[in-house]
């Protein structure tokens, strides 16, 4: 059984003012040297610097294992990014049963309500979070098979207004600013099944897909289906066409099954 340890992060306080001595990023080499039986080191992330903290904890082959994190409005999109980008082993918002409830004063301090970012002050929408996790649960066997490969990638608005995910024959340009979107906070997870087939979980973003093939420079959709997973696989709820696939802008959380082709 793998042995893991998670820790309270340094928030700039004097050692002793918080639970000190754990495997914070700067002390991980010491822990790895002295505690060789520990397999996984994980951060409890309540600080606003979420992505840079994750980057620090995936060094030297350490898998990303987030045993605790906040339940503010970044919780859902960060879960998509942890799985799609870092191929994380664990993502566990603390006080899961209270998602969506107003923060107490203590939670507010832990979750970063002393910042100017409104999303850090706002509880995660529980319906949105449930939908994200239903889609991830349905995809789980396929996601696990893609861990450690470039077939599984993700984008998040915390990286900027635009981001490009490259999959050999296609580039997926993800945008979080659009006249079709009412928010600038979102994420996108893309799972490549084969050269032309993809599963995509979108949350408040727009997608533009381009061919990277010089001999086949143009791209179009053979099909774009929205749906969910059941025991026997993907179940289509509706097929998108017309203006829906011209704009490819999505508000809320959706699971898409996309089939592409390239031509000249």
Where are the regions that the model predicts?
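Extended amphipathic secondary-structure runs
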Residues: 1-7, 194, 198, 210
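Aromatic-lined carbohydrate-recognition surfaces of secreted/lumenal glycan-active proteins
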Residues: 1-26, 42-43, 62-74
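Residues in well-ordered beta-strands of folded domains
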Residues: 4, 92, 201
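Short loop/turn segments at secondary-structure transitions that flank enzyme active sites
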Residues: 9-11, 97, 206
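Short helix/loop capping segments that flank catalytic or ligand/cofactor-binding pockets
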Residues: 14, 102, 209-210
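Catalytic-core region of carbohydrate-active enzymes that cleave or remodel glycosidic bonds
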Residues: 29-131
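A conserved mid-domain beta-alpha-beta active-site/ligand-binding segment of alpha/beta enzyme cores
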Residues: 115-191, 195-205
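C-terminal beta-sandwich/jelly-roll accessory domains of carbohydrate-active enzymes
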Residues: 173-182, 196-264
């Amino acid at each position: 059984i793998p042995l893991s340890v998670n820790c309270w992060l340094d928030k700039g306080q004097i050692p002793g003012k918080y639970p000190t001595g754990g495997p914070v990023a700067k002390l991980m080499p010491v822990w790895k040297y002295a505690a060789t039986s520990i397999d996984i080191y994980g951060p409890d992330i309540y600080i606003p610097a979420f992505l840079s903290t994750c980057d620090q904890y995936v060094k030297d082959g350490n898998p990303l294992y987030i045993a605790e994190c906040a339940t503010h409005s970044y919780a859902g999109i960060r879960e998509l990014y942890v799985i799609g980008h870092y191929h994380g082993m664990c993502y566990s918002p603390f006080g899961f049963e209270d998602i969506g409830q107003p923060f107490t004063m203590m939670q507010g301090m832990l979750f970063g309500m002393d910042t100017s970012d409104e999303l850090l002050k706002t509880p995660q929408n529980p319906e949105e979070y449930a939908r994200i996790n239903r889609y991830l649960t349905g995809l789980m066997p396929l996601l696990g098979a893609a861990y450690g490969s470039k077939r599984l990638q993700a984008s998040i608005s915390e990286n900027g207004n635009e981001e490009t995910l490259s999959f050999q024959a296609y580039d997926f340009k993800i945008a979080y600013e659009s006249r079709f979107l009412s928010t600038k906070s979102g994420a996108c997870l893309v799972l490549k099944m084969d050269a032309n087939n993809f599963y995509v979980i979108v949350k408040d973003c727009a997608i533009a897909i381009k061919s990277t093939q010089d001999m086949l420079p143009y791209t179009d959709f053979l099909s774009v289906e929205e749906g969910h997973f059941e025991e026997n696989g993907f179940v289509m709820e509706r097929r998108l066409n017309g203006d829906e696939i011209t704009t490819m802008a999505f508000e809320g959380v959706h699971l898409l099954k996309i089939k592409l082709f390239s031509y000249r």
